[in-house]
């Protein structure tokens, strides 16, 4: 049962959305997250060499967390159950790559069984999805989002470090077949890398009747190689697509929605723009993140993490954990500072935080 007092912060924002990372590991090496391939190094090296005063960044040291530090399914279920009791109703399972977590369909089933969870989704790169899809659907997964940054096999491999385009495309088809609607597909747009594919990706969304999201490149890569010049602003993407397609604005009834959306004139599919760099949506943010090792993050770009694992493993009561969650949320940052002089990139990459 939802408590009378909402889980709110000091700015009046009420939390409804919990992102749950189940692993910090990933089988891709995406250029915007874990750029550990030679092709990624070459891409960024060329960008830094072009600067008048190049200052190569110091990469974040990546160390996978040992299994003993990762929350068990029972611990994850407990946190979600308590969060739902405080008003959370949307849960998204993330990673790393969540399908690398052995028995993930068991966890999905447990989360689906929590009264009050009205939207249970997963974000995946799609590479392993065909092996797990039916079990996930039967367990209660309602929606799924895939990453698809390129439709060109060579460019796809350059971006992700894997020769996996065919697998991801097959996963998208399978998700539609299983009724995991609406199937969402995300593309991180990086200038000089895949911005020439914007129209092709949008046309793919229209033909496949997908909900496609173009996302601005964010400073969450382990190479600390993010540069503002590599960001393609959302307005630029929209302008380019409006010149090619008949797009019609979609009005949202949810002020906390991160994407500005447009439908295609023929009624098949839609595109959305997620622009955290050029058009931050912090003022309506209603999201929390639970990392795989049991930390709560109140902002994707926060430098502070709040440990729940110690409470979970230290015998804390439900009431104690609920009280701690309220304290954490009350301290939620007003906004991020990307692009400002005081911005400091988090010490964890997107793969470790959970998208």
In which residue ranges do the predicted regions lie?
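Auxiliary Fe-S-binding modules of radical SAM enzymes
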Residues: 1-18, 203-207, 217-220, 224-355
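Radical SAM/AdoMet-radical enzyme domain recognition
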Residues: 70-93, 100-215
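Canonical Radical SAM [4Fe-4S] cluster-binding loop centered on the CxxxCxxC motif
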Residues: 11-73
